[in-house]
Structure formats: C-alpha cells, structure tokens
Design a protein with these regions (language model features):
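Conserved substrate/cofactor phosphate-moiety recognition/catalytic segment
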Residues: 27-68
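The conserved Walker
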Residues: 15
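A glycine- and Lys/Arg-enriched "phosphate-lid" helix/loop adjacent to the NTP-binding pocket
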Residues: 96-145
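Hydrophobic positions on the alpha1 helix immediately C-terminal to the Walker A/P-loop
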Residues: 22
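Conserved lysine of the Walker
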Residues: 19
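Phosphate-binding P-loop
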Residues: 1-8
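Conserved nucleotide-sensing/catalytic segment adjacent to the nucleotide-binding pocket
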Residues: 52-101
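Hydrophobic anchor at the beta1->P-loop junction of P-loop NTPases
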Residues: 11
Length: 145
C-alpha cells in the first residue's frame, strides 16, 4: 500500500454477532494480498476468565485503557484491525450506570470518544449483523432457538 496514512478498522456489534470471525477473516485476506496489518483481539476476553464480566462504568473505563494500550502498540505499516470497538465501552458504561458516581466514568468515557474522533483513530467501523438476521451454522456460543 503506497500511502503514508494507516487505515485502522474496528468491528462493532452485539454479543455473538461474528465480530471476531469477521475481523480475523479481513485480517487474513488483507495479509494474503500483501498488506501489513495487526490483528488486535478483544482484551476483555483474556481478563474475563479471571475476573468475570465487566459491568460497572469504572470497569468499562479500565477495559478501555487495556484495549487502547494494545491498539497503540500496533506497528503494522497499513494499520490494525480489531474486534473490540472502544466506543462500545462508553455505550455499555452508560447502560450499566446505576449510582450517581457512575456518571464520572461515563463522562470521562464520552470525552475519550471525542478524542478518538479528533485523532481520527478509526477510519472504518464495520458493524457485524445480528446473528438472527443472517443464516449460519450454530456453535457452542449460540443458543439453538
């Protein structure tokens, strides 16, 4: 890719919508045709096994920092592809806010979203479809409904 601009891609969507699969397939395809990309997987998966689900806005703030750290480590010439959109941490923090003090984390995450936009961090945001909208094989992560 003859360009001085990196093109970073994030895949967003709800649980079990194929974000990781889509990101991995895109990464493999771009590598096969000669582009230099890093694949940055969802950091919370690694920590969820040890600590359980992250719900509080302050836990979302922490996960933002962990995920962002991995994105900033990317050195690939053409950019990175990730299956964990930082914006979703703000959305989930706002959703799970229960106490008045939670608004501190929610406000800070909103500010960080604005900084992402100012930095033009993501050049493409791909939205994974709802698994009920597209036919595909069932696996152990999805119910048989």
């Amino acid at each position: 890719m003859e360009s001085d601009k990196r093109i970073n891609v994030t895949v967003a969507g709800g649980p079990c919508t194929g974000k990781s699969t889509l990101a991995a397939n895109l990464f493999a395809h771009l590598k096969n045709i000669g582009f230099d990309y890093d694949l940055i997987e969802e950091e919370s998966r690694k920590l969820r096994k040890e600590f359980g689900d992250f719900r509080s806005p302050f836990e979302r703030f922490y996960m933002w920092r962990q995920q962002e750290r991995e994105e900033l480590r990317s050195t690939a010439e053409n950019g990175f592809i990730t299956d964990s959109c930082l914006y979703m941490n703000y959305v989930k923090a706002k959703y799970f806010a229960r106490e008045k003090r939670d608004s501190l984390a929610v406000r800070e995450l909103f500010r960080m979203c604005m900084e992402l936009e100012d930095q033009n961090r993501y050049h493409l945001i791909i939205i994974a479809k709802n698994p009920e909208e597209i036919p595909y094989k069932k696996d152990s992560a999805r119910s048989s409904d």
